[in-house]
A protein has these predicted regions:
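Flexible, glycine/small-residue-enriched loop-and-beta-strand segment within the central core
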Residues: 2-16, 23-127, 154-155, 160-163, ...
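C-terminal/domain-terminus segments
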Residues: 127-144, 148-150
Length: 170
């Protein structure tokens, strides 16, 4: 019987890390071709792909997937197990054929300053989450969320407007 094989994914040399970045269990993350801002914290089992950007003073909790084309501004909280997508037609083209690299297109997604994303959220390609917005745990975000609003549910529906003083003032 074979033993357990452990493969550690190093942090790629083409990653730009700001000052004071804390990566918990760096042998259990996969970062390549991305930018991470000053004083950001990244948990275990996080993947951040090329051409993704995380701002300053963010917290990215464990088991989170941040794909190519995602921009996360400063002071954002991302809960455990959050998944971003970047392709409107995953696995198949519009006519149903399997995609190749030639017809795959990254659709940018943005999370604005001070937003908070609960655990288990799925954020579909092309969505903008507004400044100071809060996304409830387990939501599937299919449309933009305005600044300072709550969104929750499956699919996510807009809830109440938040006070503008709930956004960090950095």
């Amino acid at each position: 019987m074979g033993g357990l094989t452990t493969v550690c994914m190093p942090i790629s040399a083409n990653v730009v890390l700001g000052h004071g970045v804390k990566i918990f269990q760096p042998d259990l993350v996969n970062l390549y071709g991305c930018k991470v801002g000053d004083d950001t914290r990244i948990g275990a089992f996080v993947e951040v792909q090329k051409n993704a950007s995380i701002g300053r003073r963010c917290k990215i909790s464990s088991h989170t997937f941040i794909c190519e084309g995602v921009t996360i501004d400063d002071d954002v909280f991302v809960g455990h197990g959050v998944m971003f997508t970047n392709d409107l037609f995953p696995r198949a083209s519009v006519d149903g054929r399997l995609q190749t690299e030639a017809d795959w297109k990254v659709v940018p997604t943005r999370v604005k300053r001070g937003a908070s994303i609960g655990s288990g959220v799925v954020i579909l390609a092309g969505v903008t989450i507004g400044e100071g917005a809060m996304i409830g745990a387990g939501a599937v975000v299919t449309h933009d969320v305005p600044d300072h609003h709550v969104a929750k549910g499956l699919p996510a529906r807009l809830g109440r407007e938040l006070s503008t003083t709930s956004t960090p003032s950095r």
